[in-house]
Design a protein with these regions (language model features):
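Ligand-recognition surfaces built from glycine- and aromatic
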Residues: 57, 67, 210-253
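Short strand-turn-strand beta-turns centered on an Asx-Gly dipeptide
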Residues: 195-199
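Structural motif
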Residues: 21, 57, 191-193
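Extracellular glycan-recognition surfaces and repeat-rich motifs
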Residues: 1-26
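Secretory/extracellular carbohydrate-interaction modules
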Residues: 24-156
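Short, aromatic/His-centered strand-loop micro-motif at the edge of beta-sheets
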Residues: 122-134, 157-182
């Protein structure tokens, strides 16, 4: 794909090792310093101009350096919901939004990115989020309530409220991610199918709404909003360098 843009933190690297093949790598380092390497096709676009909508099929071949990477990694489609951008330096103008995504997603044990109390939230997952397309400017009304996330009883109430707005679906995948596999995602209105090496692993009616962008990344970040309401986030210690290798990336409508 010729529309992919590279984004990294200092010391991390995205390198094209052959035409259409990429190596995303992070150095070792201590907790408290964010390390991140990413390819995407949306950084320069407003959310309303993101490239992808159903029906489509995404296909990627991938392997990762370890089955226990500290942080997160993955690939798929999302609306970049948490990014704020004023359109400076070639980026698209963007405000926060509720999440819409369909992706293969790995989360180390410090993470808990599920609103449902029974959904899998760690390990290698096939996952979707589907949220109403509320104009982002209206979400600004919730900003004064963000400090309440530090108060467990209030955070639990907020979590239950978000569960009413944000639909989600996820399944744990039993895959040796250190070996090459072909990952496929088929997104239709009202259905998403996840396949590994041509075999269906997960089928869900929870389909994201709106236009989405392609993202492929690895980082040492953790974020958790578990059932106990103790919201937390940060960056993890990385004793060893880690990498994500990708090839044959394609998205077809």
């Amino acid at each position: 794909m010729d529309k992919l843009r590279i984004r990294t933190t200092p010391g991390s690297e995205v390198k094209e090792t052959a035409p259409g093949s990429w190596l995303l790598s992070l150095p070792s380092g201590k907790a408290g310093a964010y390390r991140w390497a990413q390819l995407d096709d949306y950084i320069h676009l407003a959310r309303s101009a993101f490239l992808w909508r159903p029906p489509l099929r995404m296909e990627i071949s991938a392997r990762v350096s370890s089955g226990h990477v500290p942080g997160t990694w993955g690939f798929g489609l999302w609306n970049d919901p948490f990014n704020v951008s004023a359109g400076i330096g070639g980026t698209g103008r963007r405000l926060p939004a509720f999440p819409n995504c369909a992706w293969f997603f790995y989360a180390s044990p410090d993470n808990y990115l599920a609103l449902g109390d029974t959904h899998p939230a760690q390990g290698f997952l096939a996952a979707t989020f589907s949220s109403p397309l509320i104009p982002p400017v209206f979400l600004a009304a919730g900003v004064p309530f963000l400090p309440l996330l530090a108060v467990k009883p209030a955070a639990r109430i907020i979590r239950r409220f978000l569960r009413l707005l944000v639909k989600e679906s996820a399944a744990q995948l039993s895959v040796d991610v250190t070996q090459w596999h072909t990952y496929q995602l088929e997104w239709r209105a009202g259905e998403v199918r996840f396949l590994v090496d041509g075999a269906v692993q997960f089928l869900t009616p929870v389909s994201p709404l709106g236009r989405l962008g392609l993202v492929l990344w690895i980082d040492n970040q953790f974020a958790a909003f578990p059932p106990d309401g103790r919201a937390r986030f940060g960056s993890l210690d990385s004793p060893e360098p880690v990498w994500l290798e990708l090839s044959a990336i394609s998205v077809h409508e």
